[in-house]
Amino acid sequence: MENKGKLIVLEGACDGVGKSTQLELLESELSKDTECKRWHFPSYGFASSDMVRLFLKGKLGKLDEIPDEVIESYYAIDREYVWRNYLKKYYAEGKTILLDRYTTSSFIYQTLKCKTEDEKKDMIAKMKAYEYYNLGIGEPDLVIFFNGDFDTLTKLRLARENNAGIQKDIFEASVDTQRKIYESAQFVSEYLKWDTVNVTEGNAMRSKEDIHQDVMKLVRKLR
């Protein structure tokens, strides 16, 4: 597959870092002079994400009961279907694809049970080989990792969820699980050398405009 387009992924250290907002701002800015295609994974509303939806609701078993490779396959099926049917053609035409989550999320979540760094690295290598080479989906040209202080992000996220009455999924059930995800994200982002944007300052979120400026600096380097 000829690499003509650009594949930009926005990933976060945990929930509540503002990826969706930054994706909208990025699309708005880039659309001024280039064609963009935006997508959010998992692809809820598409049959390809049905297993993911059931898994996150706890319908397929408890988190510690399901092998990592099986969980990975739920997400990989969704990504492969969407890439083959919706994104591949845009990429081949030289357009910019903007993704909220991607294989990057699996690297973070599916290494949670790994006990050593070597096990984490081995798991990541297997997932990369499976999805990028066996399934043939696109490999990111740029991964922007939104990071911040865990306690600040958790406090703000819980306040939003309580006000909105949001139902938590299998990964969001406890702060302890969220902390493990956060710690996994720190390792993966450093190991894979993702470009980092900090979204907190002190005990508060930075403004979305300031964060957007940092994002644009990274994207301009790619272009």
Predicted regions and their residues:
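Walker A (P-loop) phosphate-binding motif
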Residues: 2-28
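Hydrophobic "anchor" residues on beta-strands that sit immediately upstream
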Residues: 7, 11, 96, 137, ...
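NTP-dependent small-molecule kinase module
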Residues: 2, 27, 151-223
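Short, flexible hinge/linker loops that cap or flank conserved catalytic cores
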Residues: 1-2, 137
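Conserved beta-strand scaffold positions in the cores of enzyme catalytic domains, especially
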Residues: 7, 36-38, 143-145, 194-196
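ATP-dependent small-molecule kinase phosphotransfer cores
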Residues: 34-129, 134-135
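A glycine- and Lys/Arg-enriched "phosphate-lid" helix/loop adjacent to the NTP-binding pocket
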Residues: 104-183
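Catalytic metal- and UDP-sugar-binding loop of GT-A-like glycosyltransferases, i.e.
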Residues: 12, 146, 199
